[in-house]
């Protein structure tokens, strides 16, 4: 059996989890080949959850961080399919827990995407980076928000509190450290007293909670914190937001707030709101609130992608917070008027080209006239030469004395007198008639 066949059989045995077959094939010299997608035997064993097969392959020396055509490692495969025991085996054998595939997604991203809570906990336990961002600028926390998985959200938030993002990957990260407290969970339609909420937060932050630490986050939706500040009527302004007061509601634009807050997600059961301030602890908000300033309960709801805080009728009006836009619209700048200049330049270019073409046409016509005159002149000369030849031919009589001179190579001219010529003609006439002179002999008739 060839090596290629042995490699194919090894891939199939790893896919099916046939440990004995894998050992036999490796003993017979089967190479660690891959299929057309770059999938190795360890990839297949990790994908299909064959623990013993993966262990045999690792002991045999298969690369624990082998890459497919899309840069996925065996750890990616195991995490995506929820095989926690395979994940732990790979990590213990030195697999890169923060390896990224072609989409820049780590094993933690894939485990969060597929709702594998046990794999998420295991990866965080072995030091997975919870601040890593994918190609789409999403962390594992962002994916959990999209998937509405509250359990994984809490796990990731605790891990984010315990980790410090030394090298943020987003385009505009916040460089100032921010304080973060535990998440507040609001049930659908629940009425919460804001004063008690802030006091409980202040108690947690000042009591030295070991889960609270300094972390860094990027700019995100900030409308809820802006609403809290508006309700508190803080003396210290927290933003440069433009507020338009109406009789029954006040709208605060989210893009004018300088704080950070993660998105509010819910699946009909709970709403998870994570509030983060830019270096301003929540205790400072409480100190800036007048005594008895917040005694009104409020309701947190989500309507059509907007976060709405509804306050009962009283001193504080109902407020609707518009979701912060990611990009601020830049003012329109006046474009320079270059249309007229461009048109004039194009017209001048067209005029120059037209003049050049006319000049070339005139030059061509002039040359054609010259050639025509030259041709007529040549025809006239040829006609005159033909007439001369005809006249010469008519003027030559038969038997008249003539002079014929021909060039003979390497022979001097022969002079023949008229008497000698007559004698020769007489001799020849009697026998054969008239004889023409030699064509290559120069003859001249000289009168005696």
From Swiss-Prot:
InterPro entries from the UniProt entry:
Ankyrin-SOCS_Box, Ankyrin_rpt, Ankyrin_rpt-contain_sf
Bias type Polar residues, positions: 428-448
Q: Share an example GO biological-process annotation for this protein.
A: positive regulation of transcription by RNA polymerase II
Which PROSITE patterns does this one have? ANK_REP_REGION, ANK_REPEAT
Q: Where do the ANK repeats start and stop? A: 5-34, 37-66, 70-99, 103-132, 136-166
Can you cite an annotated GO cellular component? nucleus
Q: How does it assemble?
A: Heterotetramer of two alpha and two beta subunits. The C-terminal is necessary for the formation of a heterotetrameric GABP-alpha-2/beta-2 complex, and also facilitates homotypic dimerization. Interacts with ADGRB2.
Give the protein's recorded name. Answer: GA-binding protein subunit beta-2
The source organism is Homo sapiens (Human)
């Amino acid at each position: 059996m060839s090596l290629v066949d042995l490699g194919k059989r090894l891939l199939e045995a790893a896919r099916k989890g046939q440990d004995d077959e894998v050992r036999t094939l490796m003993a017979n010299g089967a190479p660690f080949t891959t299929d057309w997608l770059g999938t190795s035997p360890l990839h297949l064993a990790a994908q299909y959850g064959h623990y013993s097969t993966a262990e045999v392959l690792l002991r045999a020396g298969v690369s624990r961080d082998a890459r497919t055509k899309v840069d996925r490692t065996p750890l990616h495969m195991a995490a995506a399919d929820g095989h926690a025991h395979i994940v732990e085996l790979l990590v213990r054998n030195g697999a890169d827990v923060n390896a990224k595939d072609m989409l820049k997604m780590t094993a933690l991203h894939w485990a969060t995407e597929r709702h594998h809570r046990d794999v998420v906990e295991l990866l965080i336990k072995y030091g997975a980076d919870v601040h890593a961002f994918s190609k789409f600028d999403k962390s594992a926390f962002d994916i959990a928000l999209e998937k509405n998985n509250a359990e994984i959200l809490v796990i990731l938030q605790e891990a984010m509190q315990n980790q410090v993002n030394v090298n943020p990957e987003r385009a505009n990260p916040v460089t100032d450290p921010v304080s973060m407290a535990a998440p507040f969970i609001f049930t659908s339609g629940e009425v919460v007293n804001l004063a008690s909420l802030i006091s409980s937060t202040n108690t947690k932050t000042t009591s030295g909670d070991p889960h609270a630490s300094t972390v860094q986050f990027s700019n995100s939706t900030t409308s809820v914190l802006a609403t809290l500040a508006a309700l508190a009527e803080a003396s210290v302004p927290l933003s440069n937001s433009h507020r338009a007061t109406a009789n029954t509601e006040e709208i605060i634009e989210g893009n004018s707030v300088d704080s950070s807050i993660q998105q509010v997600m819910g699946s009909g059961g709970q709403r998870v709101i994570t509030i983060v301030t830019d270096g301003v602890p929540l205790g400072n908000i409480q100190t800036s609130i007048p005594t008895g300033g917040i005694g009104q309960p409020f309701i947190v709801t989500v309507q059509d992608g907007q976060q709405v805080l509804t306050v009962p009728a009283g001193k504080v009006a109902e407020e609707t917070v518009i979701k912060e836009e990611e990009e601020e619209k830049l003012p329109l700048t006046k474009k320079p008027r270059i249309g007229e200049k461009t048109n004039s330049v194009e017209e001048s270019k067209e005029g120059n080209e037209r003049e050049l073409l006319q000049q070339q046409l005139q030059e061509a016509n002039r040359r054609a006239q010259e050639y025509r005159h030259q041709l007529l002149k040549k025809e006239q000369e040829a006609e005159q030469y033909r007439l001369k030849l005809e006249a010469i031919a008519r003027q030559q009589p038969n038997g008249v004395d003539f002079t014929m001179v021909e060039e003979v190579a390497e022979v001097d001219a022969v002079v023949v007198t008229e008497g000698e010529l007559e004698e020769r003609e007489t001799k020849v006439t009697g026998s054969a008639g008239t004889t023409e002179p030699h064509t290559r002999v120069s003859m001249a008739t000289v009168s005696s």
